Structures are given as C-alpha cells and as structure tokens.
C-alpha cells in the first residue's frame, strides 16, 4: 500500500476542485490548474478531500497511485500559495534586469541574453544578481528556472555562472605549475 497515495488531499477554503471521470480542475486565488489522470488510478471527492486509489493491484498502478496523489497535492499548493525558485548570478559583470515582461541578462557574452517569461510565470529582479521566478504550476516554474540557468551554468573552477540559491557547486583545483 502506498504511504503517499493513501492520504487524501485536503481542499482548503477558497479553493474549488472540479472532478470529472479522468480530469481534475482546481481554482484558487493564484489561478486555475488542471490535470488528467492516468488510466491506472481513479479519483473520488469525499468529505476530507480528494482520494486517489488504484484500479487494480498491478505494479504500474501502485507506482502511479502515489505519483498522481502528489501531482494533485502540487495543484492545490500551487493555486493557494504558489511556487518560487530563486536564482543567483555569480561573476564579475553578471547582471539581470527586467524589460517589461522580458528578462535581460548580461553574462559576459558578446551580446545580452533576453528571455521572455511564459504565460502564468512572473519573473522579478530584486538585486541585479538575484532573479525570482514565481507561478502556480510547479513544473513550469522549475522549467523556466532551468532554462535561465542553462544560459550560463556554474563552472567548477571559479564558480561563475547562474545557480540556484542554496545550490552547492562542487569546486575543482586548478592546474599545477
């Protein structure tokens, strides 16, 4: 029995969940998100929230059970509190600034990199070396953060590049004379 899958997903006040046969739509203060369930699991809405259960006892159904429950919990968390990723620019002259909804990055290249924020994602620059990405969809927030980080990933010798706040960069020793 799945330790995660057997727990019901509580629906807090101010959030409405619409459950059909194979899909779930969740509306809240941060927006509206929806997902479709895989064929191996079924969902029911009860008094204590949404309960996910496997249709049979196959290995795949048991694997999907916990995953689908976690995805539903991510939807509810996203429309209530949202998700946030913070990036840090490390390096001389590495700067970030907003131009409307686009993020302009100076990363030591011969040109500036401009990244357009997708719909549903908010990018903010506090200090010139810090970028905050927020949104309701956990997967899209992480994907946008990874795409921005990919412009200049941290290198192991001096640690220069774009890294997640709190990320540990494994360092290497330089050449010996």
Curated annotation (Swiss-Prot):
GO term, biological process aspect, one: cytoplasmic translation
Domain of life according to the entry: Bacteria
Gene Ontology molecular functions: rRNA binding; structural constituent of ribosome
InterPro entries recorded: Ribosomal_uL6-like (IPR000702), Ribosomal_uL6-like_a/b-dom_sf (IPR036789), Ribosomal_uL6_a/b-dom (IPR020040), Ribosomal_uL6_bac-type (IPR019906), Ribosomal_uL6_CS (IPR002358)
Any Gene Ontology CC annotation: cytosolic large ribosomal subunit
One Pfam family of this chain: Ribosomal_L6
Keywords on record: Ribonucleoprotein, Ribosomal protein, RNA-binding, rRNA-binding
Tagged with keyword rRNA-binding: yes
NCBIfam families: L6_bact (TIGR03654)
PANTHER family registered for this protein in UniProt: 60S/50S RIBOSOMAL PROTEIN L6/L9, LARGE RIBOSOMAL SUBUNIT PROTEIN UL6M
Self-association state and partner proteins as the record states: Part of the 50S ribosomal subunit.
Family: Belongs to the universal ribosomal protein uL6 family.
Biological function: This protein binds to the 23S rRNA, and is important in its secondary structure. It is located near the subunit interface in the base of the L7/L12 stalk, and near the tRNA binding site of the peptidyltransferase center.
Protein name (record): Large ribosomal subunit protein uL6
Gene name, Swiss-Prot/TrEMBL: rplF
């Amino acid at each position: 029995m799945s330790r995660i899958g057997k727990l019901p997903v509580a629906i807090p006040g101010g959030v409405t969940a619409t459950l059909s046969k194979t899909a779930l739509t969740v509306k809240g203060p941060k927006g509206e998100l929806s997902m479709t369930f895989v064929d191996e699991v079924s969902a029911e809405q009860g008094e204590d929230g949404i309960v996910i259960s496997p249709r049979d006892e196959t290995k795949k159904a048991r694997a999907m059970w916990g995953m689908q429950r976690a995805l539903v919990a991510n939807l509810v968390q996203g429309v209530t509190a949202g998700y946030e990723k913070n990036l840090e620019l490390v390096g001389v002259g590495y700067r970030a600034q907003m131009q409307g909804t686009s993020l302009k990055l100076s990363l030591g290249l011969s040109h500036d990199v401009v990244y357009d924020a997708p719909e549903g994602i908010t990018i903010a620059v506090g200090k010139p070396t810090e970028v905050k990405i927020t949104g309701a969809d956990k997967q899209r927030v992480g994907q946008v953060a990874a795409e921005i980080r990919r412009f200049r990933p941290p290198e192991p010798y001096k640690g220069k590049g774009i890294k997640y706040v709190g990320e540990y960069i494994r360092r290497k020793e330089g050449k010996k004379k």
